[in-house]
Amino acid sequence: MPDSIKKELTRPYGFLFTNNDIFINFILEKKNNRLITVGDVVTSTLYDRNIIPFLSIIDGKTKRQIKVKTVNENVIKVKNEKSTIRFSVMKIIKNLLDKNERATILVDGEEDLLVIPVVIFGRNNDIIVYGQPNAGAVVIINNHFVKIRVKQILEKFYVKKC
């Protein structure tokens, strides 16, 4: 990932929730939509309220040392280095979302950037949640315009062999 994109990716690309109760209430109002989480803290926060995401992407590491249990029976282990989106991981995300298959993806490495393929391959109206460090939870209601913006960001990445 080029350094020029790092600053751009530090801003939230959806609704930023700093209050867990308001965040949970918002998610519960959208219970008929597929819920996808990227990040240990947001996933754990939802698990603690018995809200099980359709797809969770976690790496088992967080600044707050929260241990996230996996509740989906389908756990897929992948490797994804820092500042990287592996093509193989993108394919797995695409296949799971296309097949409407519940799963937890456990990342050896870093999961932060995997929001990008989730948005690109997700359906319109999917609820995508990711953690905003030192701020709260960001919720994206996926749509055509978000997909266009995320594709523009992805186009700035460069391809290299892992």
From Swiss-Prot:
<dbReference type="Pfam" id="PF04019">
    <property type="entry name" value="DUF359"/>
</dbReference>
<feature type="binding site">
    <location>
        <position position="41"/>
    </location>
    <ligand>
        <name>GTP</name>
    </ligand>
</feature>
<dbReference type="GO" id="GO:0016301">
    <property type="term" value="F:kinase activity"/>
</dbReference>
<feature type="binding site">
    <location>
        <position position="40"/>
    </location>
    <ligand>
        <name>GTP</name>
    </ligand>
</feature>
<keyword id="KW-0173">Coenzyme A biosynthesis</keyword>
<keyword id="KW-0418">Kinase</keyword>
<dbReference type="GO" id="GO:0005525">
    <property type="term" value="F:GTP binding"/>
</dbReference>
<comment type="similarity">
    <text>Belongs to the GTP-dependent DPCK family.</text>
</comment>
<keyword id="KW-0547">Nucleotide-binding</keyword>
<feature type="binding site">
    <location>
        <position position="111"/>
    </location>
    <ligand>
        <name>GTP</name>
    </ligand>
</feature>
<feature type="binding site">
    <location>
        <position position="59"/>
    </location>
    <ligand>
        <name>GTP</name>
    </ligand>
</feature>
<keyword id="KW-0342">GTP-binding</keyword>
<protein>
    <recommendedName>
        <fullName>GTP-dependent dephospho-CoA kinase</fullName>
        <ecNumber>2.7.1.237</ecNumber>
    </recommendedName>
</protein>
<dbReference type="GO" id="GO:0015937">
    <property type="term" value="P:coenzyme A biosynthetic process"/>
</dbReference>
<dbReference type="InterPro" id="IPR007164">
    <property type="entry name" value="GTP-dep_dephospho-CoA_kin"/>
</dbReference>
<feature type="binding site">
    <location>
        <position position="61"/>
    </location>
    <ligand>
        <name>GTP</name>
    </ligand>
</feature>
<feature type="binding site">
    <location>
        <position position="42"/>
    </location>
    <ligand>
        <name>GTP</name>
    </ligand>
</feature>
<comment type="function">
    <text>Catalyzes the GTP-dependent phosphorylation of the 3'-hydroxyl group of dephosphocoenzyme A to form coenzyme A (CoA).</text>
</comment>
<comment type="pathway">
    <text>Cofactor biosynthesis; coenzyme A biosynthesis.</text>
</comment>
<keyword id="KW-0808">Transferase</keyword>
